[in-house]
Amino acid sequence: MTRLYDFAPSNIRAIAPYQPGKPITELAREMGLKPGVIIKLASNENPLGVSPKAYAAMQDALEDIARYPDGNSFALRDCVCRKFKLQPDQLVFGNGSNDILELAARAFLTPGTEAVYAQHAFAVYALVTQATGASGISVPARDFGHDLDAMLAAITDKTRLFIANPNNPTGTLLSKPALRDFLAKVPRQVLVVLDEAYDEYLAAELKSEAFSWLAEFDNLLISRTLSKAYGLAGLRVGFGVTSPGVADLMNRVRQPFNVNSVAQAAAVAALEDDEFVERSYALNQAGMQQLTEGLARLGLSYIPSYGNFVSFHVAQAAEVYQQLLKRGVIVRPVAAYDMPDYLRVSIGLHAENARFLEVLEQILKTRT
């Protein structure tokens, strides 16, 4: 008898599922550790947690949880428009920014088309491309970042582009002039997805301010998330900003209730709490200095990062990762990103960063 598995398209059967950072509860089960002694620095989450205002909004939203959410996210749409000076028809809301990436793929990628992205790009770009039956083209990196000239050279009449700025997992950043010049050279029929998941961790002078470019580049789609600096990773809220025509097509393939009511309420409150985001930025700056100085003290090189994480080089990275797990420290292996000798560590609280560096030093000493 033919198995149902065989009826699935070959591109679906060939997909390697996305591997998220290991949850604390999973490591506790595997290692027999108490969850309270484990620190997770693997998924680029906000170590401050969530804005108290967003938490209060969640509690209030639970009163009406038996009702379906607003399928058009009216209050959240209004909030985003006011905060970023946008128009309602420019927006698409998603169950995290991963949902925005998938909606873009569903709307604009088909078998016979191509998605171009950088060598060390976020794994989801390749995943959503493969799911549509389109071809993925990985352009070799330049200094762990985007080689924009090579990406331009890869463009054909079948191309769509994915760019992350800052890039994950390398943390590299394209300058505003370089990015804008690149967009000006991209043919207007080529969709450019600009993933700005870590924009809130950039100093003001480093931000692209790409929302202001939409009037000139109607082929640009900017993806944002509330999972990082806003601390709503567990609720899954993201949004895309683009031209009305592109937004309309993406909304046609969007599920009607893809952002739940608790997430919508929390997102509005989080977007309005500038003080919490400022605290998150300041903590990240201090934590980045703490970690990079600590890695340098241990004689380890790292990739200068503009996100809330840093990737560092260490011999036998897979073994070091396992040793960290045994000691209750979760970081992220990035061998799947063509970086087999690197690990990525998220910025945590001061004590968490110190614990990671202490444990890492112990591991390195046992190998000398």
Swiss-Prot record:
As recorded in UniProt, its EC number(s) are 2.6.1.9
UniProt-listed Gene3D superfamilies = Aspartate Aminotransferase, domain 1, Type I PLP-dependent aspartate aminotransferase-like (Major domain)
Reactions it catalyzes: L-histidinol phosphate + 2-oxoglutarate = 3-(imidazol-4-yl)-2-oxopropyl phosphate + L-glutamate
Q: Which cofactor does it need?
A: pyridoxal 5'-phosphate
Where is the PTM N6-(pyridoxal phosphate)lysine found along the chain? K228
**Gene Ontology MF: a single term:** histidinol-phosphate transaminase activity
Keyword field? Amino-acid biosynthesis, Aminotransferase, Histidine biosynthesis, Pyridoxal phosphate, Transferase
Q: Which PROSITE patterns match?
A: AA_TRANSFER_CLASS_2
Domain of life assignment: Bacteria
A Pfam family found in this protein is Aminotran_1_2
> Its GO biological process terms?
L-histidine biosynthetic process
Q: Which pathway does the database say it acts in?
A: Amino-acid biosynthesis; L-histidine biosynthesis; L-histidine from 5-phospho-alpha-D-ribose 1-diphosphate: step 7/9
Family to which this protein belongs: Belongs to the class-II pyridoxal-phosphate-dependent aminotransferase family. Histidinol-phosphate aminotransferase subfamily.
Quaternary structure and interacting proteins, as annotated: Homodimer.
Name of the protein in its database record:
Histidinol-phosphate aminotransferase
Instruction: State the species of origin.
Output: Methylobacillus flagellatus
